[in-house]
């Protein structure tokens, strides 16, 4: 065992203690930027200018037009645990500001040369330079001079200017871990963007090494600010704002349609009470709500702005306030997930309705017509108290005459019907495509294309239906409607976890899958018997074991994943030749589906309208 010499306990010097404490708050130049911007916002600023040199190491300058500080405030502001935002620990339960600990300026002063100029009513102002850590105190020949630093008269029209110079020059242990100047500049810009997103009425400007780089003007809506900063990239018409909440919280969510997606979750940004935070649970709530609408493991692009009553939230758990405790965490996540799912259902309906040609005749002749005005933009209003239902702001006009397109319960199609019809009866010579007129509207099946698509004429438009995706969705919805209905297996499946982690996964999966009709029994040796499966299950023992143990899904996702995988494996495959009866049954049920995407998010059909067909062949 390694032996060490005895060292007595001693008290650290004040300068060393300050640097250690500052290291928890000030990690890099971007940390300084975030703290100074939050101070400016707490001061009521409506215009903020950020300037940096050498990635923020040589200079960080933040000027604002807030209410400023008095000379007495300046003398105290850079001392540890001095603040105007709280007076006692009880105030932490009712925070209304971004800052509250009184540590930011003291921490910055400990690792840099700090200069503050401020005025309560210009042009007379005061300039204050706190004593830098590790240097001797300088007492100026003015009444306001103290051992803590220098205070002298200055000139400033309004607000406060904070200059941070030579960051970490007296703290080489931290400076050596900084990145290149370009990397630190990018992080400073990101910190500015994060703050600006949550405060869209405020104007921000950004200057790097004397060159103006960015201006963010005051915006009327959060969506406008998100698009202005390019945090949400794409056609503005494909982004929409959702509002919702209740008496304890309210949210604004700027969300993309399925046409805009990302390969990873980093396109989802979360803000709570004006701060950018990193919370897996909130992101996961949005992902769960969008599940089934984004194909091939893609995710939506979104900015969530959550406002929670101050007595139901705790930010005092992370030095940089990047984490938060929410009292109604589960309720908030459920509300968000439900609202996102409802949004995408409406989005699918609107896309389905927009695909219908404008001149197509309505099949409900006696139904009144109420055309909603087109979406002209996003309008944000103050939240109504206790409004439990999320509000969608002119998202998707849905005329009444299309209500018949979505019956509440589509008819059942046999899982084997389409799959096994690989040898159709030959059609009589000269047979014409059959016309159907059902509750889903009139359509004419033209036939199969490449053994993969079904060509259908409907309302003067050409539909190309992916037969596998349509059948997959029908089976998936059937499985979901029959959750809990089980069929007993004559020969039970056997699943053998190979590690403690796989055993834990099996226990969680058992809880999640049992309501669907799966029945599990654990043996003394740690293996599991599956004695029953859902009524329309078409998987195998190996497939079920793989889906549970090796899919990488968490407990909340496993049920949907297993059902979706079962539907995919049971659906008719590409190249399957279908007879006329099966084609018509599949098309009719596809048009009756509540949404036009398969469980994995791929579109079931594409629509080519009459005008587009005429345009393609150069016909007028």
Curated annotation (Swiss-Prot):
Residues 363-374 have a biased composition (Polar residues). The keyword Signal does not apply. Residues 360-382 are annotated as: Disordered. The gene is mutL. GO terms for biological process: mismatch repair. This protein is involved in the repair of mismatches in DNA. It is required for dam-dependent methyl-directed DNA mismatch repair. May act as a 'molecular matchmaker', a protein that promotes the formation of a stable complex between two or more DNA-binding proteins in an ATP-dependent manner without itself being part of a final effector complex. Pfam families: DNA_mis_repair (PF01119), HATPase_c_3 (PF13589), MutL_C (PF08676). GO terms for cellular component: mismatch repair complex. Coiled coil: none annotated. It comes from Treponema pallidum (strain Nichols). HAMAP family: DNA_mis_repair. One of its GO terms (molecular function) is ATP-dependent DNA damage sensor activity. This is DNA mismatch repair protein MutL. Belongs to the DNA mismatch repair MutL/HexB family. It comes from the Bacteria.
């Amino acid at each position: 065992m390694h032996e060490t010499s005895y060292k007595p306990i001693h008290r650290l010097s004040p300068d060393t203690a300050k640097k250690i404490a500052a290291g928890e708050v000030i990690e890099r130049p971007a940390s300084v930027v975030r703290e100074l911007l939050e101070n400016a916002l707490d001061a009521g600023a409506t215009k903020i200018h950020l300037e940096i040199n050498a990635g923020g190491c040589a200079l960080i300058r933040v000027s604002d037009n807030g209410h400023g500080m008095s000379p007495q405030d300046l003398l105290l502001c850079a001392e540890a645990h001095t603040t105007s935002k709280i007076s006692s620990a009880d105030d932490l339960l009712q925070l209304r500001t971004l800052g509250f600990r009184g540590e930011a300026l003291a921490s910055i002063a400990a690792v840099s040369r700090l200069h503050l100029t401020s005025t309560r009513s210009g042009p007379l102002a005061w300039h204050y330079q706190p004593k830098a850590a590790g240097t001797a105190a300088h007492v100026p020949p003015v009444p306001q001079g103290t051992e803590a630093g220098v205070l002298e008269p200055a000139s400033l029209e309004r607000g406060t200017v904070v200059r941070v110079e030579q960051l970490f020059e007296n703290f080489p242990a931290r400076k050596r871990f900084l990145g290149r100047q370009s990397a630190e500049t990018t992080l400073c810009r990101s910190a500015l963007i994060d703050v600006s997103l949550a405060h869209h009425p405020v104007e921000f400007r950004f200057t790097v090494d004397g060159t103006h780089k960015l201006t963010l003007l005051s915006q009327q809506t959060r969506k406008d600010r998100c698009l202005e900063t390019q945090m949400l990239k794409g056609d503005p018409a494909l982004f929409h704002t959702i509002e919702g909440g209740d008496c304890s919280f309210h949210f604004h969510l700027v969300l993309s349609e399925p046409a805009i997606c990302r390969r990873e979750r980093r396109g989802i940004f979360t803000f709570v009470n004006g701060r950018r935070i990193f919370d897996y649970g909130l992101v996961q709530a949005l992902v769960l709500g969008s599940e089934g609408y984004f194909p091939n493991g893609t995710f939506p692009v979104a900015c969530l702005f959550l406002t929670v009553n101050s007595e139901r939230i705790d930010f005092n758990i992370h030095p940089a306030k990047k984490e938060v405790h929410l009292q109604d965490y589960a309720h908030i996540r459920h509300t968000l997930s439900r609202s996102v799912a409802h949004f995408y259902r409406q989005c699918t309906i609107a896309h389905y309705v927009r695909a219908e040609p404008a001149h197509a005749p309505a099949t409900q002749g006696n139904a009144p017509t109420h055309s909603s005005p087109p979406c002209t933009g996003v309008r944000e209003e103050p939240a109504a108290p206790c409004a439990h239902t999320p509000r969608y702001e002119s998202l998707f006009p849905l005329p009444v005459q299309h209500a018949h397109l979505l019956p509440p319960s589509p008819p059942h199609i046999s899982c084997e019907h389409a799959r096994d019809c690989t040898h159709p009866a030959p059609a009589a010579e000269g047979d014409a495509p059959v016309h159907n007129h059902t509750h889903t509207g009139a359509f004419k099946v033209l036939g199969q294309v490449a053994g993969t698509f079904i060509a259908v004429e409907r309302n003067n438009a050409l539909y190309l239906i992916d037969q596998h995706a349509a059948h997959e969705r029908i089976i998936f919805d059937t499985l979901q409607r029959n959750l809990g209905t089980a069929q007993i297996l004559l020969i039970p499946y056997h699943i053998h976890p190979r590690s403690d982690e796989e055993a834990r996964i099996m226990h969680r999966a058992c809880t999640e899958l049992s309501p669907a009709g799966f029945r599990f029994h654990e043996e003394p040796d740690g293996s599991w018997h599956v004695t029953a499966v859902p009524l329309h299950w078409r998987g195998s023992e190996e497939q079920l074991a793989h889906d549970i143990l090796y899919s990488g899904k968490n407990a909340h996702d496993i049920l949907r994943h297993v059902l979706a995988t079962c539907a995919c494996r049971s659906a008719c495959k590409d190249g399957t030749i279908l007879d006329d009866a099966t084609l018509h049954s599949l098309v009719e049920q596809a048009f009756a589906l509540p949404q036009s995407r398969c469980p994995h998010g791929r579109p079931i059909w594409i629509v080519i309208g009459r005008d587009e067909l005429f345009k393609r062949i150069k016909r007028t």
